């Protein structure tokens, strides 16, 4: 089934501009899903520290989703700590690896963490199984459902998942 959706990735937007743009999109096109890429690029004028800014942006987006009865999917970068950890399991992103993780964790209904071992030059798991083409989506928070891992195969030549 086709669901009206909209992707916004303009790094010049501040949160107020984005909120207005989303409201217009929803009222004009009956959009049900909004994708925002990415949290760290949204400007918030009155917050001095990054974690304050991320928290305020998350709060505004959560309120907007509830007000408009829509889903807002927000992409977020990871901090650099994961790059310094050694081994397969240590490289799997955790909620604490998200920039502004405490606010994101508190407000999000679902948090998915994407992990592609080859990105970190990890080609074998703890049991010695080849993971070079693995692409894992870890469901690390789900307010109304189960946690777990969805394992896909990444094909580098076609940039596709199966």
Model-predicted regions and their roles:
Residues 1-48, 56:
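Conserved inter-motif catalytic segment of the P-loop NTP-binding fold
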Residues 14, 53, 100:
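Conserved acidic
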Residues 45-50, 160-162:
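Generic structural signal for short, solvent-exposed loop/turn connectors between secondary structure elements
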Residues 50-53, 131:
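Secondary-structure capping and boundary motifs in well-ordered enzyme cores
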């Amino acid at each position: 089934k086709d669901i009206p959706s909209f992707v916004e990735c303009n790094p010049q937007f501040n949160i107020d501009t984005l909120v207005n743009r989303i409201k217009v999109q929803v009222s004009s096109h009956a959009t049900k899903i909004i994708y925002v890429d990415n949290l760290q690029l949204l400007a918030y004028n009155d917050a001095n520290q990054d974690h304050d800014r991320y928290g305020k942006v998350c709060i505004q987006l959560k309120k907007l989703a509830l007000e408009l009865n829509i889903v807002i999917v927000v992409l977020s970068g990871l901090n650099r700590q994961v790059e310094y950890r050694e081994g397969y399991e240590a490289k799997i992103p955790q909620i604490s690896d998200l920039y502004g993780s405490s606010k994101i964790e508190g407000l999000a209904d679902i948090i998915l963490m994407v992990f592609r071992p080859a990105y970190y030059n990890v080609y074998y798991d703890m049991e010695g199984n080849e993971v070079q083409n693995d692409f894992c989506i870890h469901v690390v928070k789900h307010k109304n459902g189960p946690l777990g891992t969805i394992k896909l195969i990444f094909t580098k030549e076609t940039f596709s998942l199966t």
